[in-house]
């Protein structure tokens, strides 16, 4: 019986399965701005998809419409998603918008995304001493 257990443990250790994902210390929102016609987006899409498997990570994907003028109409894009990305550009004082772009916890941004780089940024944001999040409500015409 002990030999069977040791064999099973050895098989698990060498089976090539990925180690369980580390849980973030606090919930972290990860926003991906992407486009169907973007050559660099599949890698970022995959990295965010893998990050979403981490307990505590809330992944959101936004298809932007500003590449539609090139002739490839993105079926997931919405003007509101492009506006959200431009709002981050202003808030973070970035020079422009691009795809893919990942915004982590509304504070950190990555242009493009590789799994290791994204994982490190998520863990950094999860450890930040800014919990609970700062929330601001503004009245803008008919919306709050």
List the predicted regions and their residue ranges.
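Bacterial N-terminal signal peptides
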Residues: 2-11
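Active-site-proximal cofactor/substrate-binding loop regions of enzyme domains
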Residues: 10, 17-98
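Non-catalytic, surface beta->alpha helical segment in thiol-disulfide oxidoreductase systems
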Residues: 80, 90-130
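Short amphipathic beta-strand and strand-loop transition segments with alternating hydrophobic
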Residues: 134-139
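Short, well-ordered beta-strand segments enriched in hydrophobic/aromatic residues
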Residues: 142-144
């Amino acid at each position: 019986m002990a030999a069977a257990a040791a064999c099973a443990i050895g098989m698990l250790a060498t089976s090539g399965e990925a180690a369980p994902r580390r849980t973030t210390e606090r919930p972290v929102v990860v926003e991906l701005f992407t486009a169907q016609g973007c050559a660099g987006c599949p890698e970022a899409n995959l990295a965010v998809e893998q990050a979403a498997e981490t307990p505590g990570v809330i992944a959101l994907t936004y298809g932007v419409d500003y590449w539609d003028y090139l002739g490839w109409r993105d079926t997931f894009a919405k003007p509101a998603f492009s506006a959200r990305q431009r709002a981050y550009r202003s808030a973070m004082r970035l020079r422009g918008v691009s795809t893919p772009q990942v915004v982590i916890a509304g504070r950190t941004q990555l242009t493009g995304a590789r799994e290791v780089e994204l994982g490190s940024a998520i863990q950094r944001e999860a450890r930040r001493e800014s919990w609970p999040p700062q929330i601001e409500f503004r009245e803008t015409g008919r919306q709050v």
